[in-house]
Amino acid sequence: MVNVVLGSQWGDEGKGKLVDLLVGKYDIVARCAGGNNAGHTIVVNGVKYDFHMLPSGLVNPNCQNLLGNGVVIHVPSFFKELETLEAKGLKNARSRLFVSSRAHLVFDFHQVTDKLRELELSGRSKDGKNIGTTGKGIGPTYSTKASRSGLRVHHLVNDQPGAWEEFVARYKRLLETRRQRYGDFEYDFEAKPAEYKKLREQLKPFVVDSVVFMHNAIEAKKKILVEGANALMLDIDFGTYPYVTSSNTGIGGVLTGLGIPPRTIDEIYGVVKAYTTRVGEGPFPTEQLNENGEKLQTIGAEFGVTTGRKRRCGWLDLVVLKYSTLINGYTSLNITKLDVLDTFKEIPVGISYSIQGKKLDLFPEDLNILGKVEVEYKVLPGWDQDITKITKYEDLPENAKKYLKYIENFVGVPVEWVGTGPARESMLHKEIK
């Protein structure tokens, strides 16, 4: 059994909390894409655990965790994050964590060139805007992967005669191509191979053939949960390109990032924030550059876990959610942070786009069009009630249930979970048929 948790908007929907809620039922939690460019916080028994690269399943002491071949790994950050989690009391984490031998490596020079590229792009653009990269080197690493010049985990940990010398030579060639592209930037080449020679010994115990790992688990009928990174609207193919990440963050990335066939997937859970947020640049049709946006930002504490940047805020965009649903095929939804809307008298939701008076059939691929659309809103009544203490779905205010029902009817997918606060237990479950 393979179930999948995916973000349906622009990220930061609260995927980690749902994974944390579900993880006790699973034998394995796997990540399939991205790197340490995303982040979420899980609170267990009053202890906050910040996850960036590592799977959230580590909070369950009986769960194995895998970083799949689609993940890109900055090895120093891998160990720093692991040590930080261990210092907070995470038990037997090292014996439960595995890394695909096919995963690509992020180096420090990828991070340097990531920032240089961002500056270059902002200088070229007419409006001075940039992509909004986290500067973690994710894009440049996927770029070297696509150009077939990247280095993978197995290149680093290979013990065969001459393998280390080959690794250093390829590393040097990769660095030189970056210097040819961006000029002579500050970088201590002599120190880095020595650092990685130490890290390779530390990394070896974690490395597995992830294809064998996953298929053995499937054959053994293990319960597997895939933890998506980022979200569909940041997908390299289906997101608001070029204001996207560099990997496939939808259902397609699950298959290619873990090497599993489509028939193995059972449930696909779409995580949806009750309003909409976005970090970085790019079109955002329902953004509220007013007191409503500020109120959502303040009440929702909308700051990025990885970057600390303020998130842009706006009303729920059902055009986005319907588009996301078409691609990912959600079987049920988790609506998060519903409590942030508690004090709004009226709650608009975006239900269609038009441009120059002509209604669009679906979410447009052209950002020149998307940036000019007019949003039609359906205004729903608020509930003006604190819902953070409610423990059963049935006890939600009628207007809150009507809000959720409107979402269900619009996208044609049932709501199964509702987040009503930051605490681990603040998640209501609704039985679905």
Curated annotation (Swiss-Prot):
GTP binds at residues 11-17, 39-41, 311, 337-339, 419-421. One of its GO terms (molecular function) is magnesium ion binding. One of its GO terms (biological process) is 'de novo' AMP biosynthetic process. The active site is at residues 12, 40. IMP binds at residues 12-15, 37-40, 134, 148, 230, 245, 309. It comes from the Eukaryota. Mg(2+) binds at residues 12, 39. Keywords: Cytoplasm, GTP-binding, Ligase, Magnesium, Metal-binding, Nucleotide-binding, Purine biosynthesis. It catalyses: IMP + L-aspartate + GTP = N(6)-(1,2-dicarboxyethyl)-AMP + GDP + phosphate + 2 H(+). It holds the Pfam family Adenylsucc_synt. This is Adenylosuccinate synthetase. It comes from Saccharomyces cerevisiae (strain Lalvin EC1118 / Prise de mousse) (Baker's yeast). The lineage of its organism: Eukaryota, Fungi, Dikarya, Ascomycota, Saccharomycotina. The gene is ADE12.
